[in-house]
C-alpha cells in the first residue's frame, strides 16, 4: 500500500452542500438566509448585542461597582496612643486588652496601629504591627513579638 492509495473509510466523509445553485439543489434561491432584511444581505451583519437602535441590554442594566473581597481579613485594631494607660513593662495581648477594657469586641487577630504617642515600655504580642507602631513601641523601650505563624500558611506552589 502506498500513500496515494490511502482513502478515508467508506461513509466517514460527507459531501459539502453547494448553496445557491438552483431550487432543485435544496439550498437554492435565498440559500438558507430567509427572505429580505439585514441578515440576508452580504457583509457581516450587526455587531453582537446590537438591538436595532434600541438601548442595548448591557447599557440599560446598572453596573455593579465595588465588588466585595472574597476572603476579607478582619482584625481587632488598637492604636499605640491607647496603650499609655497600661502600667509599665506589662505584656499586652488581645486577651489582656479585653480584660482591661481597651477593646470591647474581638473582630479577629490583634493589629497594632501607630496613631498617637507611647511613653510606657510594653511587651506587645500581636500577629500584625504597622511599621510606625513597631518603631514607637521600641523607641519607648518596649518590644514587639510577632505572633503570625507562617509555617502553616499555604504557599502559592501548592
Curated annotation (Swiss-Prot):
Keyword Transmembrane helix on entry: no
GO cellular component, one term: cytosolic large ribosomal subunit
GO molecular function: rRNA binding; structural constituent of ribosome
Compositional bias (Polar residues): 145-158
Keyword Methyltransferase tagged: no
Stretches with biased composition (Gly residues): 23-35
PROSITE patterns with a match to the protein in the record: RIBOSOMAL_L15
UniProt entry keywords in alphabetical sequence: Ribonucleoprotein, Ribosomal protein, RNA-binding, rRNA-binding
Region called Disordered, residue ranges: 1-53, 138-158
Top-level taxon: Bacteria
GO annotation, biological process: translation
Function: Binds to the 23S rRNA.
Assembly mode: Part of the 50S ribosomal subunit.
HAMAP family membership: Ribosomal_uL15
Family of the protein in this entry: Belongs to the universal ribosomal protein uL15 family.
Protein name per the record: Large ribosomal subunit protein uL15
Organism encoding this protein: Crocosphaera subtropica (strain ATCC 51142 / BH68) (Cyanothece sp. (strain ATCC 51142))
Lineage, opening ranks: Bacteria, Bacillati, Cyanobacteriota, Cyanophyceae, Oscillatoriophycideae
Amino acid at each position: 500500500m502506498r500513500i496515494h492509495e490511502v482513502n478515508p473509510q467508506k461513509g466517514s466523509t460527507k459531501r459539502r452542500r453547494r448553496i445557491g445553485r438552483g431550487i432543485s439543489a435544496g439550498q437554492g434561491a435565498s440559500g438558507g438566509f430567509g427572505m429580505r432584511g439585514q441578515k440576508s444581505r452580504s457583509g457581516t451583519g450587526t455587531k453582537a448585542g446590537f438591538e436595532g437602535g434600541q438601548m442595548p441590554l448591557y447599557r440599560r442594566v446598572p453596573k455593579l461597582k465595588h465588588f466585595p473581597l472574597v476572603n476579607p481579613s478582619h482584625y481587632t485594631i488598637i492604636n499605640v496612643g491607647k496603650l499609655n494607660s497600661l502600667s509599665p513593662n506589662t505584656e499586652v495581648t488581645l486577651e489582656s486588652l479585653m480584660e482591661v477594657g481597651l477593646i470591647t469586641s474581638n473582630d479577629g487577630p490583634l493589629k497594632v496601629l501607630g496613631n498617637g504617642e507611647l511613653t510606657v515600655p510594653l511587651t506587645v504580642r500581636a500577629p500584625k504591627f504597622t511599621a510606625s507602631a513597631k518603631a514607637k513601641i521600641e523607641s519607648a523601650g518596649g518590644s514587639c513579638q510577632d505572633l503570625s505563624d507562617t509555617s502553616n500558611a499555604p504557599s502559592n506552589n501548592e
